[in-house]
Amino acid sequence: MKKLLVTGSTFPRWANDTEPRFILDYAKAMTKYYDVTVLVPGAVGAKEEEELEGVHVIRYHYFPIHKFETLCYPGAIVPRIKQKKIRILLVPFLLLSLHHQLKKHSKEFDVVHAHWLIPQGIMQMSVKNTPYIVTGHGGDVTSLNKGILKSMKLKCLERAKAITVVSDALQDYVKQLYPNQKTSIIPM
């Protein structure tokens, strides 16, 4: 059976968690076709590695003092930074750790599905020889569209084997910003 690595930054930390579970639900559905592993940031109180509802989950640490790994949970990265501005200092650590984990794990998989253009998509594009799919969920598509980040997002889309978005509006946005890109809509 082919192997699929799913990456994201929003994922249940444990059974019955209130964090959105759409990536877990997607990963569970894909187990019919692939041997699936999910790679997500660590969270205080969450297991580093486990089987969650039949899906293998790896949670990577991104800061030396684990109790300060508060960038992604609860909630999402941007709202967490807005809550406490100092959390922006965790972003480089998250990016470096994600890149390290992708280099470490991607070669074990036939394909990677990166949820969010930033940070998962742009980090995945730097890992050579592993085909990837990228999904845009919202702000990762509609914001940060100037300068180097726009260039990185464009390269991410160009190198992706497939591009998906979760709505018609996001598909239109991708087509405006990045002409000649084929996108599919897969609501989550």
How should each PLM-predicted stretch be described?
Residues 41-93, 100:
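A conserved catalytic-core segment of Leloir-type glycosyltransferases
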Residues 46-53, 126-127, 174-178:
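Short loop/helix-cap segments at secondary-structure boundaries that form the rim of catalytic
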Residues 7-8, 114, 136:
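Alpha/beta-hydrolase
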Residues 37-40, 56-59, 133-137, 150, ...:
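Donor nucleotide-sugar binding/catalytic pocket of nucleotide-sugar-dependent glycosyltransferases
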Residues 1-61, 107, 158-162:
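N-terminal subdomain of nucleotide-sugar transferases
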Residues 9, 117, 168:
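Flexible loop residues that form catalytic
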